[in-house]
Amino acid sequence: CFISDCAPG
């Protein structure tokens, strides 16, 4: 996950 992309994947 990244700064504003904390999703399962």
Swiss-Prot record:
The keyword Secreted applies. The modification Proline amide is found at P8. It comes from the Eukaryota. One of its GO terms (molecular function) is ion channel regulator activity. Expressed by the venom duct. Keywords: Amidation, Disulfide bond, Hydroxylation, Ion channel impairing toxin, Secreted, Toxin. Disulfide bonds join C1-C6. The modification 4-hydroxyproline is found at P8. GO terms for cellular component: extracellular region. It is found in: Secreted. Its main location: secreted. The cysteine framework is C-C. Its target is unknown, but this toxin may modulate voltage-activated calcium channels (Cav) or calcium-dependent potassium channels (KCa). Belongs to the O2 superfamily. Contryphan family. This is Contryphan Le925. It comes from Conus leopardus. The lineage of its organism: Eukaryota, Metazoa, Spiralia, Lophotrochozoa, Mollusca.
